[in-house]
Amino acid sequence: MIVGSGIDIVEISRFKKASKRWGENFLNKIFTKNEINYSKKRRFQEQHLAARFAAKEAVLKAFGNKLDHIHNWQDIEILNDKSGKPYIEFHKSAKRLKIKEKISKVVLSMAHCRDHAVANAILVRRK
């Protein structure tokens, strides 16, 4: 049963400005080492990071009014399987919320281009 849906869009130019202004502190506060390393291997690093940021925001929105239960951006980690399909690893506070809400699956979709990154997350609860 679908219990939550969230979507987010990020302007790449605004993301680049924030990244340049706040530097490594910004990236390390939002992203895990795995997410940063993945994006560094890509041609358009900022687009990949912005898509991951949008995905994290989409997941938070899908949880709705329970946002205060997730204490750290890094508790929601966006990874890719061998085929390149994105998936989410929940850690610490996000994992506790996932268990509490009986979320069995998160369907995640991300896309990016030169100007924007977008993500959609759908939370599915086991019966």
Spell out what each predicted region is.
Residues 1-127:
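Core catalytic alpha/beta fold that binds nucleotide/phospho-ligands
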